[in-house]
Amino acid sequence: MLTCNKAGSGMVVDAASSNGPFQPVALLHIRDVPPADQEKLFIQKLRQCCVLFDFVSDPLSDLKWKEVKRAALSEMVEYITHNRNVITEPIYPEAVHMFAVNMFRTLPPSSNPTGAEFDPEEDEPTLEAAWPHLQLVYEFFLRFLESPDFQPNIAKKYIDQKFVLQLLELFDSEDPRERDFLKTTLHRIYGKFLGLRAYIRKQINNIFYRFIYETEHHNGIAELLEILGSIINGFALPLKEEHKIFLLKVLLPLHKVKSLSVYHPQLAYCVVQFLEKDSTLTEPVVMALLKYWPKTHSPKEVMFLNELEEILDVIEPSEFVKIMEPLFRQLAKCVSSPHFQVAERALYYWNNEYIMSLISDNAAKILPIMFPSLYRNSKTHWNKTIHGLIYNALKLFMEMNQKLFDDCTQQFKAEKLKEKLKMKEREEAWVKIENLAKANPQYAVYSQASAVSIPVAMETDGPQFEDVQMLKKTVSDEARQAQKELKKDRPLVRRKSELPQDPHTEKALEAHCRASELLSQDGR
């Protein structure tokens, strides 16, 4: 690349195929020249568009020539879209070169913080200043790839592994508009160049590995996963071993990263696509999710519950049997979560007909796992909505298998009695220890210096247990009431945030009046 020596110019010229620096000039329209000269003019315009301009340090420089380039790009987009047999062999190297000159650049360092301070949902992205030109270059290249005249056998000499690697590096751009074009461009290249497919997958793997184990920061993970979702959908059966390894060693560890919320929908789609292709992968996938289950991040836990329900929607009954016990042990913990959104999301599983059919077929294993958590939280959870959902789940279990429900109730009652007996024995043991201490001659001396508190009767965790019949009645009544509450037409009231307590802010709010009020006062 060469820099123009014109004073005050921000132009940079790529002159690989010319004799030296050149100034852009407004060329004729392609449609205004004879057909025999159109190819030559097309190539001239492609070379003209290799001139780069400064949009950052001096946005107002070279406005005339920036408009010349914009018009040329726009014209070429229209030309290859609406004309046939215009992409001849000499056009391929020029078109690829023009794209490379404009696009392949070192991305600026992120203006947002990295590491724990980075919040992908709050931090504003830095938009590309040269987008008026870059957008048209992307549009041209996409039309070029999608044209009926495009021949991959000719293009593969220019669109090679090096080109793909540089294209993938651009996915870390902060500008979402650019990443959207990149996603479509890479997908078209993957579809048309069979020889590059394995290489593209390998390089995407490398980006993911670096993201998971080194940087934990990359702007294009969601877009890359979206491309992979389409690729996975086209995998032939039976799945190759390399594809299974990709799922287990690359996709599943992506659940560990802090910024999961940015790309989770695309990741969940990829995982479900694999399970639809090969149901035998269900057990390792679910066990990996349980392994990576968040311990202290409730919003992330809700995401895991969403994904798990998507998996259960496509699970085979034979595979469900393998994972149901560890799965429902985790669900029991979620139902007990003090974070109401986690508990609520877990209890919504009981509104899913297919999941309920799986539970019904395996109630003998599942109900004993879930019953203690459901019963305890029906009395002790702080959120009333959760009470209604729990009673609904208990009612469904009760209707599913009355005898099993009674057995679980009695078993739970027996366990509570055991806990009370253990607690009583513990209290009695402490009383014996205190009495032995009192029998010691030195007791009086030390008791004055340090008063010994009388043991307090300790209560076991959870509420007092009800009679079985009373429990059934309570469950039915509460579930019915919860259904009524859900069906009520609630008025749409906007929740208002509390006003700040700062007196200066309050005075400013009181003194504030709308512009229309001021205008009406002036009108008087």
From Swiss-Prot:
One of its GO terms (molecular function) is protein phosphatase regulator activity. One of its GO terms (cellular component) is chromosome, centromeric region. It comes from the Eukaryota. Keywords: Acetylation, Centromere, Chromosome, Nucleus. Highest levels in heart, liver and brain. Lower levels in skeletal muscle, spleen, kidney and lung. Isoform 4 is testis-specific. One of its GO terms (biological process) is proteasome-mediated ubiquitin-dependent protein catabolic process. The modification N-acetylmethionine is found at M1. Signal peptide: none annotated. PP2A consists of a common heterodimeric core enzyme, composed of PPP2CA a 36 kDa catalytic subunit (subunit C) and PPP2R1A a 65 kDa constant regulatory subunit (PR65 or subunit A), that associates with a variety of regulatory subunits. Proteins that associate with the core dimer include three families of regulatory subunits B (the R2/B/PR55/B55, R3/B''/PR72/PR130/PR59 and R5/B'/B56 families), the 48 kDa variable regulatory subunit, viral proteins, and cell signaling molecules. Interacts with SGO1. Interacts with SGO1; the interaction is direct. May interact with TP53. Belongs to the phosphatase 2A regulatory subunit B56 family. This is Serine/threonine-protein phosphatase 2A 56 kDa regulatory subunit gamma isoform.
